[in-house]
């Protein structure tokens, strides 16, 4: 699963089985899962990984499930975002987004790494969640 390789890097994190939101080969793939720290299961966030062609704009109907997840969150922390060359995506490029979606009431557990640390780890390993053919990689 695409998110397990990203989330599994953090000690003490518990997460649900990732759920595929969208699968449109060459255009868009997106996954989400719930996650929390084992010392505080009441503080749940949603983690989102979206990978899309630059031709798949925010307003496209196929992007709606991703947009709805983002819009229903009280706060959005972008953990990683970027582009990569990918011949299997429309227009030969893929854009990835990894985000933490959380409620206003969210309070980080003392076990939780800082947001900067999370961004550093996810940003340096998001490529491993994507294979060379533009599909989400298995763990």
From Swiss-Prot:
InterPro entries: GP70
Domain of life: Viruses
Name recorded for this polypeptide: Gene 70 protein
């Amino acid at each position: 699963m695409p998110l397990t390789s990203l989330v599994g890097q953090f000690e003490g994190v518990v997460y649900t089985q990732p759920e595929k939101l969208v699968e449109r080969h060459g255009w868009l793939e997106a996954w989400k899962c719930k996650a929390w720290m084992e010392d505080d299961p009441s503080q749940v966030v949603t983690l989102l990984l979206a990978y899309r062609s630059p031709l798949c704009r925010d307003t496209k109907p196929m992007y709606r499930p991703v947009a709805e997840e983002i819009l229903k969150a009280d706060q959005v922390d972008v953990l990683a975002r970027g582009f990569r060359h990918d011949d299997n995506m429309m227009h030969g490029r893929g854009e990835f987004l990894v985000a933490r979606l959380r409620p206003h009431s969210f309070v980080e557990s003392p076990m939780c790494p800082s947001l900067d640390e999370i961004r550093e780890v996810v940003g340096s390993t998001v490529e491993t969640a994507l294979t060379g053919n533009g599909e989400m990689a298995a763990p």
